[in-house]
């Protein structure tokens, strides 16, 4: 199974890249946001891509889909859990940043989701129904995805707990519409349930786990 490739760009098209890795050329399908990112890296010696490998009985020819970061790939894998959204459809639909799509899901913005390529209103409603409460952690991780030299860490490093608290409260207030007092209460309750939390992603997941359980 192929999970990551580093190589030299031989050719870049509107929705795919031909990547030379150890004298083998890999044709890799790219979401629109990744194409834009690759265009800015053509002068780099190597391109790094996290790979989703797709092959089924109905799709016997392997398809490789590339992402700038592990977080983008994680979001993609969450996205394709929605009924009627397969890997190829999901790749075409990811024409905005992960944080933008995740924010629309958490805000139940069906109108915006319906504008994504290949996603109509009915599918947008399915996305919200299936993923609301699950996409919030990508609001926190997406700002770091693809930063710097394009090589993302395989996991998010632990941050001092106060920084994690501040970051989660900011997302709850600024992006999801909670009042500051309500956001702080939600975070405090999450930490009561799991005092060992040290990362903003884990804290956000626990906040919404409590919200769903309630």
Swiss-Prot record:
GO cellular component term, pick one: Holliday junction resolvase complex
Cell compartment(s), UniProt: Cytoplasm
Example GO molecular function: four-way junction DNA binding
UniProt keyword annotation of Repeat present: no
Location of region: Domain I: 1-68
Pfam families xrefs: HHH_5, RuvA_N
Spans annotated as Domain III: 161-214
HAMAP family from the UniProt entry: DNA_HJ_migration_RuvA
Subunit annotation: Homotetramer. Forms an RuvA(8)-RuvB(12)-Holliday junction (HJ) complex. HJ DNA is sandwiched between 2 RuvA tetramers; dsDNA enters through RuvA and exits via RuvB. An RuvB hexamer assembles on each DNA strand where it exits the tetramer. Each RuvB hexamer is contacted by two RuvA subunits (via domain III) on 2 adjacent RuvB subunits; this complex drives branch migration. In the full resolvosome a probable DNA-RuvA(4)-RuvB(12)-RuvC(2) complex forms which resolves the HJ.
Protein name: Holliday junction branch migration complex subunit RuvA
GO biological process, one term: DNA repair
InterPro entries per UniProt: DNA_helicase_Holl-junc_RuvA_I, NA-bd_OB-fold, RuvA, RuvA_2-like
Organism name: Desulforapulum autotrophicum (strain ATCC 43914 / DSM 3382 / VKM B-1955 / HRM2) (Desulfobacterium autotrophicum)
UniProt remark on domains: Has three domains with a flexible linker between the domains II and III and assumes an 'L' shape. Domain III is highly mobile and contacts RuvB.
Region listing for Flexible linker, in residue ranges: 147-160
Gene name of this polypeptide: ruvA
